[in-house]
Each structure stands twice: as C-alpha cells, then as structure tokens.
Amino acid sequence: MGIVRNQSIKNSISFYIGMAIGAINTVIIYPNAFNDHPEHFGLIQILIAYAILVSTFTTFGIPKTFVRFFPVIKEKGQLYFLSLIIPLLGFILSLLVYFLFKQQIFELLNASPLLKDNFFYIILLVFFIGFYDILTAVSRSFLSAAAPIFINEVFLKVYSMLLLLLHWFGYLDFTTFLKIYLFGYFLKFAVLFLIQWKNDRFSLSFSVNDLKLKEILSFGLFVFVGGASVMLVTRLDMMMIGSMLDLEQVAFYTVAFFIGNAIKVPGKSIAAISSPLVAKALEKQDYKETQTLYTKSSINQLIIAGVLFLCIWLNIDEIFSLLPAKFQGGKWVVFYISIAQLFNMITGINGTIIVNSKYYRYDLYTNAILVLTTVITNYFLILKYGIDGAAMATAISISLFNLIRLILIKVKMNMHPFSLQTIKTILLLFVMFFTLDFLPDSSYAFVDIIWKSIVVFILVIPAIMYFKLSEDINELIIEVRKRFLDND
C-alpha cells in the first residue's frame, strides 16, 4: 500500500490543484463568461460529452485491457501494436458513420441548430481523447500515472482558464474561442505522446502472432461493453437534458453537477494507481493483498470525500450566492450527486477488482442494469423535475450499481471493504455535520466559505488521528507535521 500512498499523494496534488482550477472555471468564470449566452457553455459540455462517449467505443476497451495484460505478456511490442491499431480502426469507423448517417444522427439526438453547426468537432475530439486514454494506460502500467493526470487535471484546466478569461473580457469571439479551446485536446495528447516517446515506451512489433488474441479480445470486449456502459451513464443525464430540455439547462446542470461531483476526486487518484496493483495481486491469486487494497481504498476515500461533503454542504447557500442569478437553481442537484458519490467512495475500488478478476464478465451484467436504470429514471424524472430529476436519476443509478457490485464481490470472493473504522467514520461525519450546521453566518459569502471550511479541518483532523480511522491518512498527517512543524 506504500506505493499506492506515495503515488496517490502525487496524483492527489494534481487532482486537487485541478479541482481548485476547475472550481474557479466552473463556478466563477464559465457562468460569467457565458452569462449572456449560457447555450454556448452548454454546447461545449455536450461536444465533450459526446466525444468522450464515442471515444470509449472506438478504443474498444483497450486502455483497461492493456493494464490487465501488461504484467503477464512478454511480447510487449506486439501488445503496443494491438493497442494502437484497434483504436485507429475504431476512429476510421466513427468517421464513416458520421459522414454516412449525419442527418439520422441529428434527428436521433434532437440536435439544436447550434449543435449541428459544430458537430464535426466531436469527431476530431474522438481521436485525441481516445489515444490519450491509450497513452494514459501505458503510464499506469509503469506505475507512473502522475504525468497524464497532471496534463489532464492541471495543464488543460489552466489552458481553458486563460481562454475563458480572454472570451469573458471580449478578446475572443465565441467561434474563435471554441476552436482554440478544443485545440487544447490535441495539445495534451501531443505532450503525453512526447513523454512516452522520450521514456522509450514504444518498442513496436508489427505483429500479433505471439499474443493470445482470443483471451485478450474476449477480455477487451467485456471491458469495452462495461466501460461504454459506465461512460454512457455518466454522460447520459447531460445528453438527455440537451435533447429533452435545451443547451441552457445543460449549462446550469453542469455547474451544480461539478460542485457535487467534486467529492469523488480522491477516489480517482487512488483508483488510478491501485488498478495495476490489483491486477498483479489477482494474477497471483493473492486475495489477502486484494482485500487490503479494497479495505484501505474504502476508508481513505470515505474520510476524504466525507470531509469535502461537509465543506460543500455547510456552505451550499454561500456557494450559490456567488453565481450569476441564472445559475442559482441547482442546490438539490449538488445534494443528490454528492450523496451518490459518497456511496460510490465508501464501496471502494469494487470495479477495479471485478474487471481484473476471473469474474470480469459480471462487469457487463452490472453495467447493463446500470444503463437500463439510468435511461428509465432519467426519462421520467427529467420530464417531471427538470435538472433536479436528472440528478435524482444519477443518484439512484450509481447507488444501485455499487450495491450490486458490493454484493457480487462478497458472494463470489468473500470480500467486503467495511470495518469498524467505517462505522466510526460515518458517525463522526454525522456528528460534525449536525454540530457545525449551527455555525453563524457573516454578511460575506466568501468569508463564510473559508472560515467554515477551516473549522471543519481543525475539528476533523484531530478526530481522525485520535480514533485512528486510517493508517495511511494518519501516516500522511504525521509526515506533513514533521516536515512543516518539526524542522527547527
């Protein structure tokens, strides 16, 4: 777990810097830059959402397949070749589908004129997003996920911030802004490609003769269907809002969703480095190590996500008061998404364990249930409750999905991520919330957000240490204290 902790610290730095920049972008700059035309903000989100979804199909599950088989395949060059040729063929296929069925696609999506005029950008994004995911998988297989995470979480968001400011203050019209903004996805691909090339991680062999193609492609197929299902679910709410409501509502939903979804950041950093370690442990049938990774991921994610939830929900009215009036209607979107992600965090790296185990086929079945639930709940709840309904649907779907996976791992592998520390942490979070909810407000929202958040950390950190809720977090706190307080 030491590798996980050290890598997670590095990754978390990028994630939290990215989260801070993303928060400034999403909560302050985006709403103000697009206050007069929120549909432009909605368009950007829809373009990226569709591109990410389609790129999941074009890569055919290769990123996770690469991580899964990299430790056991001797012919690395052939695996590299296979991992590049399949996404390339997938991209060419998506290009053909677009040109042959463009009008039918527009009708199916109930695309607005603004979306139709800019739809081709999706195809270009598909290429760069897809191959960036492949390069990220290569980095993770070398236990070096820090570079792609930094590029995606920090570099791209700083780039976006600069462009948004230029657009906000009138130096770029929207058409020019959009082109330069989307060019950033080419830049992040190019930077990561050069890093991999410099580290000599591309020893290509233009052959696949020595690979167990049936096993690899079979695994890839199930991972692909599962991954596509998850990606569809994570973007479906936004897509259905765009089709059933309008692009303006997509913009309003995006801001609220971002705030609620922020608590899953620690899970991303832990999962990024845990994946190859789980793959190695399960390859050796080391279930004790797998259980350790499972339990520690759960408690670490719960503690950090829980603290973030306290900071967000105790300040929710102050946060929304900082937004332009048009964007202030998403309070309950934040609540539903936050609760769903809290449950997601407490269930640990369940998806990583299933995908890397002999039960990986169940990933397909659980994702099929997830997609079905998401489509049905979004359709009816969006019609009745608008963007609040979309958040309710997402919360129901994510919670049911993780509950099924939790039960599956317990039944098939006799493992669960919970311990006495889990109960202690949940009780601590409840006590903290009901105690701090009575903190007085000042007349300044920004001041309230800062001082309430500081109080949360001042009270929670000693409690974590006293009750010994997490070995890893305790060690991290001790290291930080020694570095900054004991250097006399």
Mark where each language-model region is:
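Hydrophobic alpha-helical transmembrane segments
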Residues: 150-165, 169-198, 219, 368-373, ...
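Interhelical loop/hinge segments that connect adjacent transmembrane helices in multipass membrane
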Residues: 1-4, 114, 170-180, 190-234, ...
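Transmembrane helical elements of multi-pass membrane transporters/channels
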Residues: 7-23, 180-196, 209-280, 300-301, ...
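Membrane-proximal transmembrane or re-entrant/amphipathic helices at the cytosolic face
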Residues: 434-488
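Helix-loop junctions and terminal segments of transmembrane helices
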Residues: 58-74, 141, 256, 260-298, ...
